[in-house]
């Protein structure tokens, strides 16, 4: 939701084995970020029953579908947002050039990220 993803479909989910705690849904799996001038921030898989637009309001409203209270959902959103802000450093660390990083910025940096960080 906070990173645009051109490869968004129902079979793109992964699980992590947490030892005796069992399996957990992976927080991120097979993301293919794309700048917003190439693809709008709209998901192929809807957030609720009717809508796929990337929106924190919609995500918060749908939190109950996932067994989360609003407070729990907001804590997760903020955690994901905090990690998302490290994308530039991560890209540099793996050898991305400044021009490539700047080209991809809109896939990561947008108003929803700013709002998520403020939760």
Regions found by a protein language model. Give the residues of each.
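Anionic ligand-binding catalytic core segments
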Residues: 1-10, 14-119
């Amino acid at each position: 939701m906070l990173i645009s993803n051109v490869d968004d479909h129902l079979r793109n989910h992964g699980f992590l084995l947490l030892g005796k705690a069992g399996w957990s849904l992976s927080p991120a799996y097979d993301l293919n970020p794309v700048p917003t001038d190439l693809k709008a921030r709209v998901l192929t898989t809807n957030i609720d029953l009717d809508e796929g637009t990337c929106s924190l309001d919609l995500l918060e409203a749908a939190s109950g579908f996932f067994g989360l209270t609003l407070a729990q959902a907001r804590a997760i959103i903020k955690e994901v947002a905090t990690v998302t802000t490290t994308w530039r450093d991560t890209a540099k660390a793996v050898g991305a050039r400044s021009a490539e990083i700047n080209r991809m910025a809109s896939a990561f940096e947008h108003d929803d990220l700013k709002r998520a960080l403020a939760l």
